[in-house]
């Protein structure tokens, strides 16, 4: 297991690489290039510069999150083949610089959804929350709300240039139901996985967040059955999963422990996001993102990591969203301090699992 932390780049992240390098046990960075629009090829020189910058700080770059998928691919438009070829070229370029895993999602319009990016806990720390009754019927209202609370940073999956076209996007997706989205996903995977096999990269899909339909948009990465379907569409180790414990567990019907154990054992989880959530009494699926420690949330983090360890997990892991604590400000979910605490906690659990096995 290699502990990492997500970093958005020197021009897009308040957290410095030198600060990440000081977090005990963190060996690498999960990187991205924020300003390349979906559908465009990632130039080799940009990838090379990112890798060199990260390695100069004493950290590794083995995972990219994310190479966003153009909506024409998800919708199934005739232009999708052009964007798929661009995606394949990006895969080759990333592999040339030692990238092993690409995390991505296949969600229409919104890459993730929360009702509140500034949810206050009893200790006055700030976190993100999802309360169903607080989600407006008009998607433009949630866009305005998110952009007003983004801390001055572009949020992944909520890039302003893309969301400025949200009305057109909803119109484009109006005839895309779950069956059609699944067909388009299969088309994409069958096209790119041979390239991944050729260059040694694992494409690792992130579960839908939340894992159920919103605004009438379909979801196809929402439960154990969907993950099994994805793995079987192209039966290859290169066709993999980024298991996000918080996202998959947002639906209480999903048994995150069993799902983690099964797909680690099947060697389909090269990368994991590990976070805790706390369900609220206001609704069955209402929750806030809790501190990583088990006692603060609804998930048993030891049980999650034990499922990973016992089934041979040897991939990359990162603490997922953290609270804003100790007066820190910045991109919601991605401050330094609480994620550093989360990384240390997860590393401690892993050390205990290793030593208990000896």
From Swiss-Prot:
Its cofactor is Fe(2+); Mn(2+). This is Mannonate dehydratase. It comes from Lactococcus lactis subsp. cremoris (strain MG1363). Catalyzes the dehydration of D-mannonate. Belongs to the mannonate dehydratase family. Its EC number is 4.2.1.8. HAMAP family: UxuA (MF_00106). The keyword Lyase applies. Pfam families: UxuA. It catalyses: D-mannonate = 2-dehydro-3-deoxy-D-gluconate + H2O. GO terms for molecular function: ferrous iron binding; manganese ion binding; mannonate dehydratase activity. NCBIfam families: PRK03906.1, uxuA. Keywords: Iron, Lyase, Manganese. Pathway: Carbohydrate metabolism; pentose and glucuronate interconversion. InterPro entries: Man_deHydtase, Xyl_isomerase-like_sf. GO terms for biological process: D-glucuronate catabolic process. It is an enzyme of class 4 (lyase).
């Amino acid at each position: 297991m290699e502990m990492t932390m997500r970093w958005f780049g020197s021009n897009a992240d308040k957290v410095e690489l030198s600060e990440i390098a000081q977090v005990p046990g963190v060996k690498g960075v999960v990187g991205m290039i924020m300003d390349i629009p979906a559908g465009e090829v990632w130039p080799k020189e940009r990838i090379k510069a990112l890798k060199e910058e990260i390695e100069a700080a004493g950290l590794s770059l083995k995972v990219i999150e994310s190479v966003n998928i153009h909506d024409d691919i998800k919708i199934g438009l005739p232009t999708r083949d052009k964007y798929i070829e661009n995606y394949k070229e990006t895969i080759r370029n990333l592999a040339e610089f030692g990238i092993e895993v690409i995390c991505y999602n296949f969600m229409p319009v919104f890459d993730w959804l929360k009702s509140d990016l500034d949810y206050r806990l009893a200790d006055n720390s700030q976190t993100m929350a999802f309360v169903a009754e607080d989600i407006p019927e008009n998607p433009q209202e949630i866009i305005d709300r998110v952009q007003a609370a983004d801390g001055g940073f572009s949020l992944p999956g909520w890039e302003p240039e893309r969301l400025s076209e949200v009305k057109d996007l909803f119109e484009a997706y109006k005839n895309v139901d779950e069956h059609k989205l699944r067909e388009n996903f299969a088309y994409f995977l069958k096209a790119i996985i041979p390239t991944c096999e050729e260059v040694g990269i694992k494409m690792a899909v992130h579960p839908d967040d939340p894992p159920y339909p919103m605004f009438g948009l379909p979801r196809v990465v929402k439960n154990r059955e969907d993950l099994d379907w994805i793995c079987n569409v192209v039966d290859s180790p290169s066709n993999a999963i980024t298991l996000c414990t918080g996202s998959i567990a947002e639906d209480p019907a999903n048994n995150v422990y069993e799902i983690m154990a099964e797909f680690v054992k099947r060697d389909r989880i090269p990368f994991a996001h590990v976070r805790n959530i706390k369900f609220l009494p206001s609704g069955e699926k209402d929750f806030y993102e809790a501190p990583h420690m088990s006692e603060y949330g609804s998930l048993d983090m030891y049980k999650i990591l034990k499922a990973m360890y016992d089934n041979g997990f040897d991939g990359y892991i990162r603490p997922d969203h953290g609270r804003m604590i100790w007066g820190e400000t910045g991109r919601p979910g991605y401050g330094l301090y609480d994620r550093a605490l989360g990384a240390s906690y997860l590393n401690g659990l892993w050390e205990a699992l290793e030593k208990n096995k000896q």
